[in-house]
Each structure stands twice: as C-alpha cells, then as structure tokens.
Swiss-Prot record:
Transmembrane segments: none annotated. It comes from Drosophila mojavensis. It is found in: Cytoplasm. Catalytic subunit of the molybdopterin synthase complex, a complex that catalyzes the conversion of precursor Z into molybdopterin. Acts by mediating the incorporation of 2 sulfur atoms from thiocarboxylated Mocs2A into precursor Z to generate a dithiolene group. Substrate binds at H101, R102, K117, K124, K125, E126. Pathway: Cofactor biosynthesis; molybdopterin biosynthesis. The lineage of its organism: Eukaryota, Metazoa, Ecdysozoa, Arthropoda, Hexapoda. The gene is Mocs2B. This is Molybdopterin synthase catalytic subunit. One of its GO terms (molecular function) is molybdopterin synthase activity. One of its GO terms (biological process) is Mo-molybdopterin cofactor biosynthetic process. One of its GO terms (cellular component) is molybdopterin synthase complex.
C-alpha cells in the first residue's frame, strides 16, 4: 500500500514505521531528512518549504508506481514531506519502504530520495541568523536547465542534437534561392499580387453584366462592378453548386437544349410535392382539432387510420358512460331552420336603406 502525504506539523516517524511494517517483510528501510544548522559558513535557523500541492502529490504517486515496477517485491511505501517552517534538527522528509529482502528495500529508498529531489515541485527557503528574510535555494538536481541572466538570452546548442544528413536527399525535390531577405520578401509579395489579379480577372469575367442587346450597352456598363449586387446566379436543384446563365448569340443555326422545358418539368414535380404536403398538413390539422376537443393525445408514429380509430373509440366510451350524449341531446328540424333563417343575410338597395333610416328617425322624433 502507498502512503503519500504533505503535512504542516511535525512528522511522527513511529507512526510511519507502523504503517509500513508487515509480517511477510524482513526488511524496513527508512530515510529521514532533517534541517542542519549551517550552510556555507552561515548559521541556519530554519527552513521554509512551499509546494504546488496537487502536482506534488501526483508526482509522489508516480514515484511509488515506478518503485513497484523496478522492485515488484515491495510491500508498503510511505513518502511524507513537511511544508511550512521546519526548525533545526527536525524532520522535513521521511521515505520508508518494506520488502521481504534487504537489497530491494535499501536500493528503492535511495532511488526514491533522488527522484523526490528531482521531480516533485517543492521549494526550499533558508532562514539565516542575521537575515530573517532568507534566500530561496535552487534545486541543482532538477532535470530542466537553470536559467540565469546570461543563459536566458543565449541558445544552448548542446541541448539540441542536430543530425546533418543532407547528402542523400534528391536535388529534384529542393529549390535553392540565394537572395537576400528583402529580395525574397519582394518576390513573395509579387507572387501574391499576381494571384490576386488573376482571381479578380476571373471574377469580372464570371460576374460582370454582359449586355449585348445594343452596341452602346457595353459602353454604358461601369468600369468596376460588384459581384454581390450585379451577379445573377441560379441554383441547380439537388446540387450544391450554381449554374451561371448567359444568353448566347450564335450566327450558326444549331440545335440547343430546351432549358425552359427541363426547368418546367423539375418545377412541376416540386409543385406536386408541395401540394401533397399541403393536403397532408390540412388533414392533420383537422384531425388534430378533433383530438384536442376529445382530449386524445396522439402518437407520432400512428398513421391517419389509427388516429381515426382512436377517435371512434373515444366516442363509444362517451356514449356508454353518458347515454344522454346520444339520445337526449338532439336538434330538431325546426331549430335547424330557425338557425338557418337567423344566419341568413339580407340584401338591401340604397333607396330601401334610406327608407329604413327615415323610419328610425320618425320613431325617435315621436
């Protein structure tokens, strides 16, 4: 089992020893790192540790995984590191390993100490007796290069291995231009300008209005045109491209395809399809109104016959539960005739309307 932890209190070595001890293991190796009281002639009071905690725990877990790959017989692994202020002679890091045999335990602990110093993002600051601010110490064992004011501006060619193998490359695939940067930039700009002019020329040919009905029509066209406002494009049915339609004037009498009849055929099929869709929409709308009135929730997968059948079943249920729905509520012929008479509208001429208005005035005068 792996035990990894970052703590801010004093590390309990006995507790860690109890975590890694096992009956099947004959060796327990423990490394304890403490704070010494001097460094380069300066008296050290304490050390302060800071860490990128989430990344540090992740890297410590990777160390445990690598230890188990290298030494599969390891039983328990414990890596504890202290953060914050660590006084002199107190423990800052503890690495403990248990294994069946001594060599695996000793070698794995030594490897874990080196790996912890080089890969885990934990930073150390030394507090001296005469300097309470302290000094951050660079980790000389980390794999990445140490940048200084001089090295940050320079490029380390020794870190990049350049393999020079140019002799076997065929000359047909290479183009060598021996000019200055200014000349090379000028050539690139000229190339781009030429390609832009070609595109503009094709746009003028494709989209510019071609009026040939009169000899003066060509002179009336503007010199510059806009493809967005002056172009005429007809979209081809069932295609993602466009057809540019032009009127052709030929001296020779040749048979040309009848484009109008072909377009009419295509448009006829489209109109028929639209009519069918409209008829289906009307039928569905009428059925939907009846279903809403009868409080029936239709299913999207049902066809029209199933929906009519559901309406009939609903009517039968209403007739069975309420007999008056069928027998007692009936409108006679007289009531129908009365409604028809009331709904009938009369037609009056202007002289008849004037007589009617004058009669109303007489009634109010009396």
């Amino acid at each position: 089992m792996d035990h990894i932890k970052l703590i801010r209190n004093k590390i309990d070595i006995n507790h860690i020893h109890q975590l890694i001890i096992d009956q099947s293991c004959g060796a327990c190796s423990v490394f304890v790192g403490t704070t010494r009281d001097h460094f380069e002639g300066k008296k050290v009071i304490s050390l302060e540790y800071e860490a990128y905690e989430s990344m540090a725990l992740k890297e410590m877990g990777k160390i445990c995984s690598e230890l188990r790959i290298r030494w599969p017989t390891l039983k328990h692994i414990a890596i504890y590191h202290r953060l914050g202020s660590v006084p002199v002679a107190e423990e800052s890091v503890v690495i403990a390993v248990s294994a069946p045999h001594r060599p695996a335990a000793l070698e794995s602990v030594s490897f874990a100490v080196d790996k912890l110093k080089s890969s885990v993002p934990i930073w150390k600051k030394e507090i001296y007796e005469n300097d309470q601010i302290g000094e951050w110490k660079a980790n000389m064992e980390c794999p990445w290069p140490q940048f200084t004011e001089t090295s940050s501006n320079a490029f380390e060619y020794s870190l990049c291995k350049i393999e020079r193998q140019v002799e076997n490359i065929s000359e047909s695939k290479l183009v060598q231009i021996r000019v200055s940067d200014i000349e090379l930039t000028r050539r690139i700009k000229c190339f781009l300008k030429r390609k832009r002019d070609e595109i503009n020329l094709h746009n003028i040919i494709d989209f510019k209005q071609q009026l040939r009905d009169s000899p003066r029509a060509e002179s009336m066209l503007p010199k510059d045109s806009c493809a967005r406002t002056q172009s005429i494009l007809v979209k081809q049915q069932q295609s993602i491209s466009h057809i540019k339609v032009h009127r052709a004037f030929e001296d020779r009498r040749q048979t040309r395809p009848d484009y109008s009849s072909q377009l009419n055929k295509l448009m006829a099929t489209k109109h028929k399809h639209c009519e069918l869709v409209k008829s289906n929409v009307l039928k569905n709308a009428r059925l939907q109104n009846i279903e809403e009135y009868m409080r029936i929730t239709p299913d999207d997968e049902d066809n029209i016959y199933n929906r009519i059948k559901n309406i009939e079943n609903r009517i039968l249920i209403l007739e069975s539960t309420s007999p008056e729905y069928k027998y007692y509520i009936k409108l006679g012929k007289e009531s129908n005739n009365i409604n028809k008479k009331e709904s009938k509208k009369g037609l009056y001429q202007s002289d008849r309307l004037s007589e009617f208005i004058s009669g109303i005035k007489r009634q109010y005068e009396l």
